[in-house]
Every structure is written in C-alpha cells, then in structure tokens.
Amino acid sequence: MQAIIDAEQSFKFPVLVGDIGGTNARFSILVDSNAEPKEFPVLQTADYATIDEAIQHAILDQTAIQPRSVILAVAGPVDGDEIDLTNCDWVVRPKKMIADLGFEDVTVLNDFEAQALAVVSLEGHHMEQIGGKPEEAVATRVVLGPGTGLGVAGLVRTRHAWVPVPGEGGHIDIGPRTERDYQIFPHIERIEGRVTGEQILSGRGLRNLYLGICAADKITPTLETPVDITSAGLDGSNPQAAETLDLFATYLGRLAGDLALIFMAHGGVYLSGGIPVRILSALKAGSFRAAFEDKAPHKAIMRDIPVRVITYQLAALTGLSAFARTPSRFEVSTEGRRWRMRR
C-alpha cells in the first residue's frame, strides 16, 4: 500500500467530519450523502494526548460504522504531512491515520475554511443579524471568529461555485484610534513587539483588554477569567468589565469593517465562535455597528452590509458536511491537503 496526495474532489461514504479547535473537538459521521449526521459528544482536546487517540476512543470505539473518508478542519495552516495545530498540542498526521485507523482518504482544511463553507449551508434560524440589509445577497462574504484565537476567512462567489479563502488574519496588527485607546494600549501584552488582533479579540484577549483598562485606571484587577469578566460586564456589576465588553465590541466592529472593505463583502460579515454568542447583547448595544460602519468615505456601502452572528455550535461540521455531500458546489483546493490510500 502507498499513501499519495490527490486533489480530486469526491468522497466515499461513510465520511467522518471533524472540527478541531484549540479547546474543543467536534465530530459527526455521514453514512451517505442524504443521511442526517450521526453526532458525538464534544471532546476536550486536553483530555487526549493525540487526535488519533481521541478519534479511536471517542468515535470509532462508540459505533459500528467504519468511515472510509475523513474531512477535518483544524486551527492553523495546513502544510505538509505533519500539521501542527494553533493553540493545541495535537499534531495531525494523515498518513498515520490511514495506516492506524483504517481510513482510505483524509482531507485536512483550515477551521475557518469550514466556517466559510458553513455560511452558505446554515438555516436562517441559526443566525442573528446585526444591521445591514435584511435580504441575503449571493455575493462575497467574510467570516470572523473570536474564540480561543481569532479566525478569519473569506468566501468568494464565482459564476458557479463558492470559493473559501482561508488565512491567518487573527495575527494582523491592531492599533489605537481614540484618546481612550491610547491610554489602554500601552498596557496590552505584546508578542514580539506587536499587538495583534488575537491579543485583544479572543478569550485571552478579553482578559488582556480588561487588565489594560485596570492598569490605565490605576486600580487592582478583581476578575480572573474571561468568563468572570464577561458575566460582570453583562450585568454591569464591574465598571472596568463593562468597558471591556464595550471596547471589545468596538474593536471587533472596526476589524470586521476593515475585512468587509478588503473583500467588498456585500454578502455579509459572519461572526462565529462562542464569544459572539455569549456577548450578543453587547454586540447589539450599538458600539459594534457604529465602529463597523465608520469607514469614510464608504459609510453608505458599510450601512448596507449585514453582520450575522452564527448561533449554531456545529456550524463548521455543517460546512464540512455540505462539502462532503456536494463538493461541486464549492471550489476547494485540496492539492497538498488530501491523502488517499491506494491499494
């Protein structure tokens, strides 16, 4: 037997689809192209030493179905036969999966590529709109997801298909604009001298922002975790936490607006991940949308672009499942990202 890389787009069922984030891993199995997915409990990546161990014990040992194909979405760039995950110690080794777990075909995509596939595959009730035109345009879209890290992807519409454009947009520079920003930013933790989007617009970024506000105000922080900060900000019990959520929404709106301009995303900007859902009321309060639209000389364009918060936890699996069922609907390059067993 010889494992080779193949760019052909068609998948043999059953297909195991998996969304591997920095903290959680979600899996489901499609028995055929028409079947509803068989879902499995959400896994904590820290509970398993390797992804192979997680798949074996939590998936394969729990069902009589043996998947022939696997499509994984992972947090981080996909490059080579050993794929390191961002914010997680797992390493994806597709050839080893084929040899050890009985798969015939393994495809690995970027996690926000899967989120991009999802935005044209989800039902309307899986999203909450914040401003912009109510109708859904068949046009380019952007997905932005603050969570363990900050994921970014585009989704470009061609004549006949949707083309996901993955990237590492969470690591772009983010800087101060207002007088208050200039008071806070000197206290934000830097990575090699830079403040990146992920240093503010993520779970740990939320805490970085809170600590920066406390330092600017010359007070001792009393809240430890992003969950504590979010809760205190939402109920108004802590002024610094409340400002943290307001500024988080503002900075997220600025970045979302920048990306909408870069892609000219008339199809909308989509916010995914756990944080936007948890702080939905803060995102709807006004600061987010005001920052999103404040893009002179193109405010009129920005007013029309909708922002939608994805409220469905299994969105990435929905996107991967859509790709598995109807690959011709999408133009996804699997060159160098697909490994097949030839017998």
Curated annotation (Swiss-Prot):
Q: Which CDD domains match?
A: ASKHA_NBD_GLK
**Record: residues binding ATP:** G18, D19, I20, G21, G22, T23
Specify whether Transferase is a keyword of the entry: yes
Q: Where in the cell is it found?
A: Cytoplasm
Under Enzyme Commission nomenclature, its number is 2.7.1.2
- InterPro entries, per the entry: ATPase_NBD (IPR043129), Bacterial_glucokinase (IPR050201), Glucokinase (IPR003836)
Q: Which GO molecular function annotations are given, in alphabetical order?
A: ATP binding; D-glucose binding; glucokinase activity
Quote a single Gene Ontology cellular component term. Answer: cytosol
The main place the protein resides is: cytoplasm
Q: Which UniProt keywords apply?
A: ATP-binding, Cytoplasm, Glycolysis, Kinase, Nucleotide-binding, Transferase
**Catalysed reactions, semicolon-separated:** D-glucose + ATP = D-glucose 6-phosphate + ADP + H(+)
Cite a single GO BP annotation: glycolytic process
Family statement: Belongs to the bacterial glucokinase family.
PANTHER family registered for this protein in UniProt: GLUCOKINASE (PTHR47690:SF1)
State the name under which the record lists this protein: Glucokinase
Q: Which source organism does the UniProt entry give? A: Brucella suis biovar 1 (strain 1330)
Q: What is the lineage of its organism?
A: Bacteria, Pseudomonadati, Pseudomonadota, Alphaproteobacteria, Hyphomicrobiales
